[in-house]
Amino acid sequence: MAEPGSQGHTVGPLLLLLLLLLPRALPEGPLLFVALVFRHGDRAPLASYPTDPHKEAASTLWPRGLGQLTKEGIRQQLELGRFLRRRYKAFLSPEYKREEVYIRSTDFDRTLESAQANLAGLFPEAAPGSPETDWKPIPVHTVPVSEDKLLRFPMRSCPRYHELLRESTEAADYQEALEGWTDFLTRLGNFTGLSLVGEPLRRAWKVLDTLICQRAHGLDLPSWASPDVLRTLSQISALDIRAHVGPPRAAEKAQLTGGILLDAILSNFSRTQRLGLPLKMVMYSAHDSTLLALQGALGLYDGNTPPYAACMAFEFRGSSREPEEEDGENVTVSLIYRNDTSRPPLPLRVPGCPAPCPLGRFQQLTAPARPPAHGAPCHGSYEPASPPATVPLLAGAVAVLAVLSLGLGLLAWRPRCLRALGGTV
């Protein structure tokens, strides 16, 4: 019998059963594979607005042009690369090896340059300042923006995605929030010279982007751009992002956006393991929208925009437990998010799974957000699923195996054919 006052420490049969049924975190084993998705570094504003007091001096303030990577952005990516070198020093070879690391970027100057700066920190021999005899340039792969469905997504070209977005923006809670900001957007339109009421919220976001970039570079903001105004603009931006990656129909949106990248990451790992390839790391240099869509697909969007050089890591590890336990799962997935250089990276947990998460459970939980095998509907037909986004090294290995299989098949077929024709074996 329990002593008085000790009832709170008694575990009943039902509670014990619930505890046993809860997903359990597995001990982390050796690192097998890493996928990194990071935002480009600090850049110039993407645009200006009619009454921008710094508009006339733009060519002086941003000598490389609007939207281009700044010196601070280069420094941020160099520092991120050095952080990655420290974290994965024991996992990666000291020098770049093409069979171990693959880098993909969107086809924008700022992301291509960010990838190069990052690699200069990760592999110092890739730094332009290295002695000429030691300098080893590292390839960064890309595809035209119009063809990029891995890191840019079919947002503008996909009718089905626009149907889903329209459903979100016509929802009662969205319209109610928007109505509450009508007076604010009217005043902001008067201040900026832009028409903002009844227009896509991205136009208001561009004002916020310009102000944030200018403030970060020590420029004076207009008197109307108070902290309260910037805070309200951030809230409007968060509403717009939720409409793009959140409910309703968040899973179907993800199948056309971040779920494509998530599926490619899982496919790259599984093929690497199945084929016994030496590939260890895949790096994606992209945008805040890429990370936001990926967070949406994982159910991890928290209302905040990823800062410059923010990085999400998918770390696949072998479990140290016996593979015959439970469902035979012996691989775990850990999600790491680095969004602040002054603090250690944050461990993330996919809803419904402990950290680290068993790979099978991770695949099960994220399946609704990933494109089905036949692809996700877009133009009345189907967008292809992940195979086109697979790292070419893996695709090449599959092709080689296919050729070998075909060759072996022909060798096996030839004697039977010759026998049928009465020829010699």
Swiss-Prot record:
<dbReference type="GO" id="GO:1990264">
    <property type="term" value="P:peptidyl-tyrosine dephosphorylation involved in inactivation of protein kinase activity"/>
</dbReference>
<feature type="disulfide bond">
    <location>
        <begin position="213"/>
        <end position="311"/>
    </location>
</feature>
<feature type="topological domain" description="Cytoplasmic">
    <location>
        <begin position="414"/>
        <end position="425"/>
    </location>
</feature>
<keyword id="KW-0472">Membrane</keyword>
<dbReference type="InterPro" id="IPR033379">
    <property type="entry name" value="Acid_Pase_AS"/>
</dbReference>
<keyword id="KW-0732">Signal</keyword>
<keyword id="KW-1133">Transmembrane helix</keyword>
<dbReference type="GO" id="GO:0030971">
    <property type="term" value="F:receptor tyrosine kinase binding"/>
</dbReference>
<feature type="disulfide bond">
    <location>
        <begin position="353"/>
        <end position="357"/>
    </location>
</feature>
<feature type="active site" description="Nucleophile">
    <location>
        <position position="40"/>
    </location>
</feature>
<keyword id="KW-0325">Glycoprotein</keyword>
<dbReference type="GO" id="GO:0120154">
    <property type="term" value="P:negative regulation of ERBB4 signaling pathway"/>
</dbReference>
<comment type="similarity">
    <text>Belongs to the histidine acid phosphatase family.</text>
</comment>
<dbReference type="GO" id="GO:0010977">
    <property type="term" value="P:negative regulation of neuron projection development"/>
</dbReference>
<feature type="topological domain" description="Extracellular">
    <location>
        <begin position="28"/>
        <end position="392"/>
    </location>
</feature>
<dbReference type="GO" id="GO:0048168">
    <property type="term" value="P:regulation of neuronal synaptic plasticity"/>
</dbReference>
<dbReference type="InterPro" id="IPR000560">
    <property type="entry name" value="His_Pase_clade-2"/>
</dbReference>
<protein>
    <recommendedName>
        <fullName>Testicular acid phosphatase</fullName>
        <ecNumber>3.1.3.2</ecNumber>
    </recommendedName>
</protein>
<feature type="active site" description="Proton donor">
    <location>
        <position position="288"/>
    </location>
</feature>
<dbReference type="GO" id="GO:0004725">
    <property type="term" value="F:protein tyrosine phosphatase activity"/>
</dbReference>
<dbReference type="GO" id="GO:0003993">
    <property type="term" value="F:acid phosphatase activity"/>
</dbReference>
<feature type="disulfide bond">
    <location>
        <begin position="158"/>
        <end position="378"/>
    </location>
</feature>
<dbReference type="InterPro" id="IPR029033">
    <property type="entry name" value="His_PPase_superfam"/>
</dbReference>
<dbReference type="GO" id="GO:0042476">
    <property type="term" value="P:odontogenesis"/>
</dbReference>
<dbReference type="GO" id="GO:0010955">
    <property type="term" value="P:negative regulation of protein processing"/>
</dbReference>
<comment type="function">
    <text>May dephosphorylate receptor tyrosine-protein kinase ERBB4 and inhibits its ligand-induced proteolytic cleavage. May play a role in odontogenesis.</text>
</comment>
<dbReference type="GO" id="GO:0016020">
    <property type="term" value="C:membrane"/>
</dbReference>
<dbReference type="Pfam" id="PF00328">
    <property type="entry name" value="His_Phos_2"/>
</dbReference>
<comment type="subunit">
    <text>Homodimer.</text>
</comment>
<feature type="signal peptide">
    <location>
        <begin position="1"/>
        <end position="27"/>
    </location>
</feature>
<feature type="transmembrane region" description="Helical">
    <location>
        <begin position="393"/>
        <end position="413"/>
    </location>
</feature>
<keyword id="KW-1015">Disulfide bond</keyword>
<keyword id="KW-0378">Hydrolase</keyword>
<keyword id="KW-0812">Transmembrane</keyword>
<dbReference type="InterPro" id="IPR050645">
    <property type="entry name" value="Histidine_acid_phosphatase"/>
</dbReference>
